[in-house]
Each structure stands twice: as C-alpha cells, then as structure tokens.
Amino acid sequence: MAFVSIAPLASRCCVHKSFVSSREVKPLCRTIPTLGRCRRGKTVTPSISMCWTATVLDDGVQRRIANHHSNLWDDSFIQSLSTPYGETSYLERADKLIGEVKEIINSISVEDGELITPLNDLIQRLSIVDNIERLGIDRHFKNEIKSALDYVYSYWNEKGIGCGRESVITDLNSTALGLRTLRLHGYPVSSDVFEQFKEQNGQFACSAIQTEGEIKKVLNLFRASLIAFPGEKVMEEAEIFSTIYLKEALLKIPVCSLSREIAYVLEYGWHMNLPRLEARNYIDVFGQDPIYLTLNMRTQKLIELAKLEFNIFHSLQQEELKHVSRWWKDSGFSQMAYARHRHVEFYTLASCIAIDPQHSSFRLGFTKITYLGTVLDDIYDTFGTMDELELFTAAVKRWHPSAAEGLPEYMKGVYMMFYETVNEMAREAEKCQGRDTLNYARQALEAYIDSYMKEAKWISSGFLPTFEEYLDNGKVSFGYRIGTLQPILTLGIPFPHHILQEIDFPSRLNDLAGSILRLKGDIHSYQAERSRGEESSGISCYMKDNPESTEEDAVTYINAMINRLLKELNWEFLKPHSNVPITSKKHAFDILRAFYHLYKDRDGFSVTRNEIRNLVMTTVIEHVPL
C-alpha cells in the first residue's frame, strides 16, 4: 500500500494557534430583494443560509469571513473507528468467492439447453456484466467481462440485438442494455438502433400495462440515454420518454426492489453517480429480489462477494481516513477559523470513485490537494487582502521554502503545506511514471493561482466581466485540473506526454470538465456568494450581457449549456478508436462525477450537513451487514 506520507510542517512554518485571532467580529449582510433578506446576522435564501463576517485581526486589518459551518468529523471520532473486515479470514473467503463467480460467468458461455439457450445467451451475458459492475466487483473479472462483451458485439447489427443470437426479432431491453454497456467499454455502437422501436407518431412503443418486464425495459432505455453523444436526437427523445414513464411507474407500483432501483437511477443518473455509492445501493436492491438474476445460487454468490468486498475496502478506508484526519490536525489546519474543513468529505469522494485498494496514493493525494485548494479558495475569495494575495501568488511562482518568509503569518503554514504536498505527490508520481512530473504540477498550480488572482481583482474593483470572459477564467479557478493531474499520475497507469495532453490542459476533456463544474457550481452557490459581495458568477455575467433577462432566464440558459457540454464530454470520454484508452481517462472523468455529485442539490462544498454527510456515513463509516 502506497500512502502519500507528508510530514507535519516544520515548527518555523506551522501555526499551532488560531489562524484568526480577532479583536472584533461584526456580522455583515447584504440585502438582496430577489434572493432573501438578512435577519440576526444571516442571509435568508430559499436554499442556503449564508452571510459574511467582518473580522479585525490583531494586525488591525479588516477581513471578510464567510460563515461556513465547522468540521463535522472530530478527529477523536475518526481515530476511534474500527472494523474486523481486514482480518485474514474475510480476505480468504473473498478470494474463494472470486473463483466461484468466475466459474459462474464462464458457465454462461456454455449452453445447457435449459437456462442458457441460443434465444437468451446475449441478454444473459449482458445481465451478468451489468450486475457485476453495479455491485462494484468488476475489477476482479476484466477478462471475463471482455470475453462476454466481445461475444455480444459479434452479433450486434444496425438494428441492435435480440435476447439471443438466434432471436428472430430485436428486443428493446437487450438493445438498450447492450448499447449502454458496449459504449461504456469503447465499442462503436450507434444510437440509430432505437429508431425501430418508435411508432409512427414518434413515440417509443410500449405496453400500456406497466409490468415488471416493461418497466425494466424502459429503465435500461433511460440508462442508455444518459450517455448520449452530441447530435443524437433519438437519445434525447429516449430520455424524455423514459423519464416520464418511470416517474409515473413510481406512483403506481408498490415499494420494492425495482421501485428503489428506479428512484436511485432517476436521482443520480450517470454523471452524479459514484461507483461505491451505487454498489452500496445495489447490494440492497439486488439482494432482495431474485428477478435480477435467473439462478438463485448465482445471486447468493454475487451478493456475498459484493458485501465482503465492500467491507474489506471499508477497513482500508478507515485506516486511510485516520491518516487524513491526523494530517489535518497535526498540520495546524484545524485552527483555521476562516476556512471550510472538508477533508473527510473529499476523502469520501475519492474513495467512492477509486475503489481499487491499490489506489491509496490517488485517494490520499486527491483528498489533500482538493482540501488545500478549498483553503486557497477561502483566502482568495474572502479572507486575504489584495496586497497579501499578490505576495502569495508571487511565492507560489517562486516555489521555494524561503518564499514563505515574506508572507503574513496565517499564510505561511498554508504555503508550506502546499509546497510539501505538491512536491511529495510529484515524488510519488515519479515512481509510477519513471520521470519527473513536478513541472506539470507547477504549471497547473500557477494557472490556478493566476485565475484566483484575477477573480480577486474583479471582486476588489467591482468589475463584472462578460459571460465568455468569466467562464474562460472560471473553468480554471474551479480547480478541476489541480484536483486531477497529480492524483491520476499515481495510479500506476503510464501517462506519456502525448497521452497526458489528451487528458490534462489543453485537452478538450479538461476544458469541458472545468466549464461544466464551474457552471454547475454557480447555479447552487450564486446566492450565497452574492451575499458576500462576490458579484462575478455565470448568472450575473449572463444577465449583464443580456440586460432584459432574469435570474430564471440565466439559470435556464446555463442548464441547457451544461446539458450540451455533458454530451460533448461523453464523446471525449467514450469515443471509439481514440488514441487514449478509456481506462486512461476513467479516473479523470470520475473526478468530474465526484465534484458534480457535490452540486446535486446545493453547494456541497460549503454545506455538507445533509446529503454529503449521509454519503460519508453510508460509504465510509458504516459497514454492510453480512
């Protein structure tokens, strides 16, 4: 196991007292008629309570502090976590089950004339692959999955497929599940196959009676529609139709495994879905209803393995989380009153997308660099003065420990921790890549800091840029690039320069991801940021460019833009015959999904008491009952 081991700061740079020693704290609120009003130090809005506080430090400087809620996860609680699932007996049982499940998968390729026939062999293969992937155990069966999908693809044609290779007619369920699964694995499949399932009026043909089979068919159509490429009109039509159908079905059918599956898929879709969260949900869905697989023995083996794998990884998560919490506490960050303390939440996101135990360096690196990025966000957006920000920006570009000496006391520890973390991650990456990658990281960090500096100047001067100018800078300041670049270099996957350029800046994938996340974040953080005097957002800039528009118009425009960009991102990630394998792009794409998940209903960076807290509990703190 390769941990990113970063020692605490040297005593000359570490600040072990409060980073904010205030003489006067005065709450300030801005009155925004369309968004809410202030009451007793809080800005009341429909979605979030937020205001900022003017704080005068011992140095006499008045600063702004956003009233973010404190850390929810006490270090003593984290250090007290324990689980037995790292013991040898559980590991040995899991290894035995892996062998038995491989036998089950291989048995599907053997026709027995009863359960596996030429009339169902395709859907049987697709179903086992789909279930293995959704249960989060697919890393053990890469060869078996490829063999199954190669077989299915060999019978794929311009009309899709039937349930089996000798089926006379094509089947919507098999075709929808087949298109989704094959496309996710890089096979070239066209969405035109769905045209034949539409009636003359353009609507998809479907029985008026919502049986389990009919509902399952439409559910797979919906899942397939979410990985649409640009220009695929039939996929847009499929998404609209299936969304309406499934919502109506939820109102009619009783609460059961199928209804829970529908509710989950409708809520999280694909871009907000996280592999470990899906596995946790699907373990319950899949294990309670045998309709999901033909053989009960197969169901039992898969479920037992999925539960064991979940809990074994859970034991590793707790050890890594203890490391993260100690790092946060020992480094002095716990004393920073002005910053958002979201290290536990960031680790949770990392461990929900990188569920291979071998990727410890990725999880820890992502956690630390994104936490530090959030601290910088709070310094540049609210706490730092313009003179201090200029000093910090210059220090980052100088990149030397001595550069910390000219910084304000509260900045010294932040700078040194950034310096140590980035350098340590570069050393970790060098072990995997066989070359020094520090220059890549420094270039990304400098671009990140420059974008922050530009936004700070906008805030200070009251300047409101055009929408295009704002987004061009905002897609960098979101921090997707610094949160992605160094962590993926520690995965053990080779990233030669020409491959890295297709994922990192200036690639289209990187550009799209940064733009999507910036715009998605603006929709949920706009009100709170405006209450703190931060006028620049995609919504404000759009309204400036279009004086007759309303906030609702701006949100509608931005949502439509996000949907269009997501389709482009799907293409960049999944396009067949690419020079860059999907496996090389997967974690960069999954990092987008992690950030996107934070903005599902609110600004999850700032407010983590609700959905994100539940995510931590269900995927990191609690194990699955066996």
From Swiss-Prot:
The keyword Lyase applies. SUPFAM superfamilies: Terpenoid cyclases/Protein prenyltransferases, Terpenoid synthases. A motif (DDXXD motif) lies at residues 377-381. CDD domains: Terpene_cyclase_plant_C1. Mg(2+) 1 binds at residues 377, 381. Mg(2+) 3 binds at residue 529. Its cofactor is Mg(2+); Mn(2+). Binds 3 Mg(2+) or Mn(2+) ions per subunit. This is (R)-linalool synthase 2, chloroplastic.
